[in-house]
């Protein structure tokens, strides 16, 4: 196997939307970093059967709606 070809594979902490925390191995971040999920199996409509909702991160959805509001 070639040296320095593959990314570092290490343990990170994952925090789900309900506060549950678990550890998994990933190439994301550094050893011991924490990732907070916006959507996970406990809150995603595909798994919960609820209505779909949009997360407006950075106003992207609002800008899209404003741009195409008269188009239908």
Curated annotation (Swiss-Prot):
<dbReference type="InterPro" id="IPR002150">
    <property type="entry name" value="Ribosomal_bL31"/>
</dbReference>
<keyword id="KW-0699">rRNA-binding</keyword>
<keyword id="KW-0689">Ribosomal protein</keyword>
<dbReference type="InterPro" id="IPR042105">
    <property type="entry name" value="Ribosomal_bL31_sf"/>
</dbReference>
<dbReference type="Pfam" id="PF01197">
    <property type="entry name" value="Ribosomal_L31"/>
</dbReference>
<keyword id="KW-0694">RNA-binding</keyword>
<comment type="subunit">
    <text>Part of the 50S ribosomal subunit.</text>
</comment>
<comment type="function">
    <text>Binds the 23S rRNA.</text>
</comment>
<comment type="similarity">
    <text>Belongs to the bacterial ribosomal protein bL31 family. Type A subfamily.</text>
</comment>
<dbReference type="GO" id="GO:0006412">
    <property type="term" value="P:translation"/>
</dbReference>
<keyword id="KW-0687">Ribonucleoprotein</keyword>
<dbReference type="GO" id="GO:0005840">
    <property type="term" value="C:ribosome"/>
</dbReference>
<dbReference type="GO" id="GO:1990904">
    <property type="term" value="C:ribonucleoprotein complex"/>
</dbReference>
<protein>
    <recommendedName>
        <fullName>Large ribosomal subunit protein bL31</fullName>
    </recommendedName>
</protein>
<dbReference type="InterPro" id="IPR027491">
    <property type="entry name" value="Ribosomal_bL31_A"/>
</dbReference>
<dbReference type="GO" id="GO:0003735">
    <property type="term" value="F:structural constituent of ribosome"/>
</dbReference>
<dbReference type="GO" id="GO:0019843">
    <property type="term" value="F:rRNA binding"/>
</dbReference>
<dbReference type="InterPro" id="IPR034704">
    <property type="entry name" value="Ribosomal_bL28/bL31-like_sf"/>
</dbReference>
């Amino acid at each position: 196997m070639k040296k320095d070809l593959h990314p570092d594979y290490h343990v990170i902490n994952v925090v789900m939307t309900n506060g549950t925390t678990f550890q998994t191995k990933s190439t994301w971040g550094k050893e011991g970093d924490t990732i907070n999920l916006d959507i996970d199996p406990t809150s995603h409509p595909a798994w919960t059967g609820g209505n779909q909702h949009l997360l407006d991160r950075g106003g992207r959805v609002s800008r899209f709606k404003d741009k195409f509001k008269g188009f239908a």
